[in-house]
């Protein structure tokens, strides 16, 4: 199977997000890479499902709370930026202060 670097990146994000989802489901608090992957994968999937950039920017702030992540993580994550593929092309989605 031949994958482009972008496709490899998306698979890596998905794999990390799947791990984060499982850990979150077991009641574990997510660390920095897990939190970023969890939010990023949700944005990528939302774009694939046809949501708009504005919808995804709003949705990204509802995915994780302070209780879902380790201490200090919300202060470390100011923005999450994801280059997502929409029906009309690739766009950059920025979620400001995603962990509230």
UniProtKB/Swiss-Prot annotation:
The keyword 4Fe-4S does not apply. It is found in: Cytoplasm. Keywords: Cytoplasm, Hydrolase. SUPFAM superfamilies: Urease, gamma-subunit. Pfam families: Urease_gamma. The keyword Cytoplasm applies. One of its GO terms (molecular function) is urease activity. Gene3D superfamilies: Urease, gamma-like subunit. This is Urease subunit gamma. It comes from Nostoc punctiforme (strain ATCC 29133 / PCC 73102). The gene is ureA.
